C-alpha cells in the first residue's frame, strides 16, 4: 500500500509542477495529475467514466477532489485543538470573530456547540466543518482529547485522509498523544504535527520533537524554526522557502514575510540540513540529489516532503501558538502541500456477494455510490447521519440502499455541517463528508445505489470499563428517561444500557466516570429528567484457566410437551493470542444431535457466558467444544437443547478453575518533584505497578498500571497530596487477573448481595 501511495505521489510530481497546488481555483488544469495517476492505479478507464457521466462533469469532479483535504485535529486534552480550529475558521473566513474555548465571553468556540462543552472547556463530541484556503476545500473534524471520549476519535479517523497531531510545547508527548497516534497508525493516516503553545513559560519545541521520535516512533523533522520562545515568541522561519514570517494585526491575520534574521542564519541552515537528511532517508529522489551534493531547491524539497508524508514515511513538524494567533496560516499551507487528496488514499470495501472479498474502491464520482455512516446525532429535524462518500454521487431525493439492513431509503435532505449549523446542498460526490436527515440506520452501516453490495470495514470499538445504576426520580419521567438512553446508546457505541437481573436496576456502562457523568447531565438538561445515580462499578469479567468436561442430560417427560436433550464435550480457555472472546466448535461425527439443534446449543452456551457463577459478570476468552450428545425423536426441541447447554455450562464451570479479571488502567502522573515520594507511595497502596519515571524540569512524570477499582476519587486525593499542583490522565490498558484475596472478597460480596452463603 505504501508503495502504491508513493507511486501516485511520484506521478504527481512528474506530471505537474508543484507550484500549481497554490494556484487560484480558476487557473487550475481541468484534470490534475494526482487524479489521473490515482485513476490509472485503480485501473479505471476513461470509457467507463464516460458511460457513467458526461466527460466535462467527470473532469470537474476530479478537479474538485484534487483540491480537497479531509483532515482531523487530534491531541491530548488541553493541547489546544479547538483553539487551533477556531483560528483556522477565522483565517479562512468561515467565522468573523474569534471566541475562546471556555466561553468566558458568553459565546465559546464555534466547534464546541454544546453548553456542557463550553462550561467545562473540553470537547465532548467530534464536530465537523469545512472551509476554503487558497482555492482548496478543507473538511475538518475536531475531536475530543479526553480518553473517555476516544470513540469520537476512532470514528473520525476512520473516514479521514489526513490529520494534524497537536502537541503541547510544555507538556510534550502525553498519554493521550500516544493513544491518538496509535489510532492514526491503525487507520494508516498520513499526518503533520503542530507543536502548540510556544508562548507558554517552559516551551521547548526541540524537546517535544525528540519525544515524538522516541515515544511515538515518528520519523520527523521540523519544517520551521521559531523566532524566540515564551514571551519573546515573535514568528517563524520556513526551512523550505528560507523566509521569516511574522503575524501582525489584531488577530494575527496579516502574515508579513522577510529575510531570515542574521542572528539565526546558522541555526536555520543546521535545521534545514537536518530536514533534508531525514527526508532523504525515505525518499530516493531527494537522497540522490543530497548524496551528489546538489543544491536542494525549495520546490524539490517540498515535493519530496509530500511524497514521504503521503506514503506515511515522514511527519513534518510545524510550530506556533494558536492562542496568540501565530503559525496557523503556514500550518494550513502545510495541509495543502503535504496531506493527500481523497484520490491518493486507498480505501477498501468488502463484497458481500463474494464472501466478503476485499475490494479496492476507485474513489471517483463515476463509480456506483458507496458511503459509510460514521456518526449519528439527534437533530431538531430528526436523526442526523454523517456520511463519508467513498465512491459515486449522492443527490437529494435519491433512493439509496442500506447494505447492512437491506432497506431502501429516500434521501429527503442533504446538508454540509459547520459545527451545529447546516447548509443545504443538492448533491455530494466521492471524497466529501456530508450529513443526511431522515435516514434510519446505525453507526457503521454502508449505503450504496443498489448496483453493488459492498460494506466498509468496521472501526475499532473499545469495551466499556465502568458502570452506574441510574433511575428516574419521578416515575412519570420513565418515558423520557428511556427515550434518552435509547438515543445515546444509538449515537455512541461505547455507551451501553443493560438491566441488573438481581435488582432490576438500569445499568449504564461507559469508558469512565466523566463519560457517564456527562450522559447523566445530558439526561437532566436535554430531557428534563432528574436521575438517581448509584456508586460507580467496575466492569469485571470472568474467565477459566483449565479444561473441564461436561455431560448433561436435560429431561422432562412428566406430562405435557416433553423436553429431551443431552450435550457432551468440554470447555477450555482460548489461547492468549486469540482475538475472540467466545468460540463454539461442533466436533460431533454423525447425527447424535440433528444439525438443526446445533444453533440452539451455541445460543445456550452464549447465554450462559453472560453471567459467570463467581460474581455474575460475563465470561470471556472461552472455547466450547461439542463432541457428543443424544436426542429424542419426539421430545427434543431447540428449547430443550438450549436449556441443556446452559445447565451443562453451570455444571462444569467450577471445575475449570474460574478467575475474575479486572480492568487495569495506564495512569500518567505529573507532579512537582517534591511530592514524588508521597504520590508513588500512594500508588503502591492502590496496588499500582510503577513502569516509568522521568524528570521534566521541576516535575516528575510517573507512569504506572493500576486496577481501576482502586482509582475512584483519585482526583481529590491527588489535589490533596500535591497542594493542587499535580495532574494525571488515565486510559484503559487491559483486563488482568485479580489476586486471590481480592477474588475471595468479590465473591463473598456477590453472595451476600444475593442472600446466599
From Swiss-Prot:
Function: Mitochondrial GTPase that catalyzes the GTP-dependent ribosomal translocation step during translation elongation. During this step, the ribosome changes from the pre-translocational (PRE) to the post-translocational (POST) state as the newly formed A-site-bound peptidyl-tRNA and P-site-bound deacylated tRNA move to the P and E sites, respectively. Catalyzes the coordinated movement of the two tRNA molecules, the mRNA and conformational changes in the ribosome.
Keyword GTP-binding: yes
Residue numbers binding GTP: 75-82, 142-146, 196-199
Stated name of the protein: Elongation factor G, mitochondrial
Lineage start: Eukaryota, Viridiplantae, Streptophyta, Embryophyta, Tracheophyta
CDD domains reported in the protein's UniProt record: EF-G, EFG_III, EFG_mtEFG1_IV, mtEFG1_C, mtEFG1_II_like
GO terms for MF: GTP binding; GTPase activity; translation elongation factor activity
Annotated InterPro entries: EFG_II, EFG_III, EFG_III/V, EFG_IV, EFG_V, EFG_V-like, EFTu-like_2, G_TR_CS
Predominant subcellular localization, coarse grouping: mitochondrion
Further comment: This protein may be expected to contain an N-terminal transit peptide but none has been predicted.
Pathway per the UniProt entry: Protein biosynthesis; polypeptide chain elongation
UniProt GO cellular component terms: mitochondrion
Cross-referenced SUPFAM superfamilies: EF-G C-terminal domain-like, P-loop containing nucleoside triphosphate hydrolases, Ribosomal protein S5 domain 2-like, Translation proteins
GO biological process, one term: mitochondrial translational elongation
Amino acid at each position: 500500500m505504501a508503495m502504491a501511495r508513493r507511486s501516485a505521489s511520484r506521478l504527481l510530481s512528474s506530471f505537474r509542477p508543484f507550484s500549481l497546488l497554490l494556484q487560484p481555483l480558476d487557473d487550475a488544469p481541468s484534470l490534475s495529475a494526482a487524479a489521473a495517476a490515482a485513476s490509472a492505479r485503480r485501473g479505471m478507464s476513461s470509457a467507463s467514466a464516460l458511460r457513467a457521466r458526461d466527460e466535462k462533469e467527470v473532469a470537474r469532479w476530479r478537479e474538485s477532489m484534487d483540491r480537497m483535504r479531509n483532515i482531523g485535529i487530534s491531541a491530548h486534552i488541553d493541547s489546544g485543538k479547538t483553539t487551533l480550529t477556531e483560528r483556522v475558521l477565522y483565517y479562512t473566513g468561515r467565522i468573523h470573530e474569534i471566541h475562546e474555548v471556555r466561553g468566558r465571553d458568553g459565546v465559546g468556540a464555534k466547534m464546541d456547540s454544546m453548553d456542557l462543552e463550553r462550561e467545562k472547556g473540553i470537547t465532548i463530541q467530534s464536530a465537523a466543518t469545512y472551509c476554503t484556503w487558497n482555492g482548496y476545500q478543507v473538511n475538518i473534524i475536531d475531536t475530543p482529547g479526553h480518553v473517555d471520549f476516544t470513540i469520537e476519535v476512532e470514528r473520525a479517523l476512520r473516514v479521514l485522509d489526513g490529520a494534524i497531531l497537536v502537541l503541547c510545547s510544555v507538556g510534550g508527548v502525553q498519554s493521550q498523544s500516544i493513544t491518538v497516534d496509535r489510532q492514526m497508525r491503525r487507520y494508516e493516516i498520513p499526518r503533520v504535527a503542530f507543536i502548540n503553545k510556544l508562548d507558554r513559560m517552559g516551551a521547548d519545541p526541540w524537546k517535544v520533537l525528540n519525544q515524538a521520535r522516541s515515544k511515538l516512533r515518528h520519523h520527523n523533522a521540523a519544517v520551521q524554526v521559531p523566532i524566540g520562545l515564551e514571551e519573546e515568541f515573535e514568528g517563524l522561519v520556513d526551512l523550505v522557502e528560507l523566509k521569516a514570517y511574522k503575524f501582525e494585526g489584531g488577530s494575527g491575520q496579516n502574515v508579513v514575510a522577510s529575510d531570515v534574521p542574521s542572528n539565526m542564519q546558522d541555526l536555520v541552515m543546521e535545521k534545514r540540513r537536518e530536514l533534508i537528511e531525514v527526508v532523504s532517508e525515505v525518499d530516493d529522489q531527494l537522497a540522490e540529489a543530497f548524496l551528489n551534493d546538489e543544491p536542494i531547491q525549495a520546490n524539490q524539497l517540498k515535493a519530496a516532503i509530500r511524497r514521504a508524508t503521503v506514503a506515511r514515511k515522514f511527519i513534518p513538524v510545524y510550530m506556533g501558538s494558536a492562542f496568540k494567533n501565530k503559525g496557523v496560516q503556514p500550518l494550513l499551507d502545510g495541509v495543502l502541500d503535504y496531506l493527500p487528496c481523497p484520490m491518493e488514499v486507498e480505501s477498501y470495501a468488502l463484497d458481500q456477494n463474494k464472501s466478503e472479498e476485499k475490494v479496492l474502491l476507485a474513489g471517483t464520482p463515476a463509480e456506483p455510490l458507496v458511503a459509510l455512516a460514521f456518526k449519528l446525532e439527534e437533530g431538531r429535524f430528526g436523526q442526523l447521519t454523517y456520511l463519508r462518500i467513498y465512491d459515486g454521487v449522492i443527490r437529494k431525493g435519491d433512493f439509496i440502499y442500506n447494505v447492512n439492513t437491506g432497506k431502501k431509503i429516500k434521501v429527503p435532505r442533504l446538508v454540509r455541517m459547520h459545527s451545529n449549523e447546516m447548509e443545504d446542498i443538492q448533491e455530494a460526490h466521492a471524497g466529501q463528508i456530508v450529513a443526511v436527515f431522515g435516514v434510519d440506520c446505525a453507526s457503521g452501516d454502508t449505503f450504496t445505489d443498489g448496483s453493488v453490495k459492498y460494506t466498509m470495514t468496521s472501526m475499532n470499538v473499545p469495551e466499556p470499563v465502568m458502570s452506574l445504576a441510574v433511575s428516574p426520580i419521578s416515575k412519570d419521567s420513565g418515558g423520557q428517561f428511556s427515550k434518552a438512553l435509547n438515543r445515546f446508546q444509538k449515537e455512541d457505541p461505547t455507551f451501553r444500557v443493560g438491566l441488573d437481573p438481581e435488582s432490576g436496576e438500569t445499568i449504564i456502562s461507559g469508558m469512565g466516570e466523566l463519560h457517564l457523568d456527562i450522559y447523566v447531565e445530558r439526561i437532566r438538561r436535554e430531557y428534563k429528567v432528574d436521575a438517581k445515580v448509584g456508586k460507580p462499578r467496575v466492569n469485571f469479567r470472568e474467565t477459566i484457566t483449565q479444561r473441564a468436561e461436561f455431560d448433561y442430560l436435560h429431561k422432562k417427560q412428566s406430562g405435557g410437551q416433553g423436553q429431551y436433550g443431552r450435550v457432551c464435550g468440554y470447555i477450555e480457555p482460548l489461547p492468549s493470542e486469540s482475538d475472540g472472546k467466545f468460540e463454539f466448535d461442533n466436533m460431533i461425527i454423525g447425527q447424535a444431535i440433528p444439525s438443526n439443534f446445533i444453533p440452539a446449543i451455541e445460543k445456550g452456551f452464549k447465554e450462559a457466558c453472560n453471567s459467570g457463577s463467581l460474581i455474575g459478570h460475563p465470561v470471556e476468552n472461552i472455547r466450547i467444544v461439542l463432541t457428543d450428545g443424544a436426542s429424542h425423536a419426539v421430545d427434543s426441541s431447540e428449547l430443550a437443547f438450549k436449556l441443556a447447554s446452559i445447565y451443562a455450562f453451570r455444571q462444569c464451570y467450577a471445575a475449570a478453575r474460574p478467575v475474575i479479571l479486572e480492568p487495569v488502567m495506564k495512569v500518567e502522573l505529573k507532579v512537582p518533584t517534591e511530592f514524588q515520594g508521597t504520590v508513588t507511595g500512594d500508588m503502591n497502596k492502590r496496588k499500582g505497578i510503577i513502569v516509568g519515571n522521568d524528570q521534566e524540569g521541576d516535575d516528575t512524570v510517573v507512569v504506572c498500571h493500576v486496577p481501576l477499582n482502586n482509582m475512584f476519587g483519585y482526583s481529590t486525593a491527588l489535589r490533596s497530596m500535591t497542594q493542587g499542583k499535580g495532574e494525571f490522565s488515565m486510559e484503559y490498558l487491559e483486563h488482568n487477573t485479580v489476586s486471590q484475596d481480592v477474588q475471595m472478597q468479590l465473591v463473598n460480596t456477590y453472595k451476600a448481595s444475593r442472600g446466599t452463603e
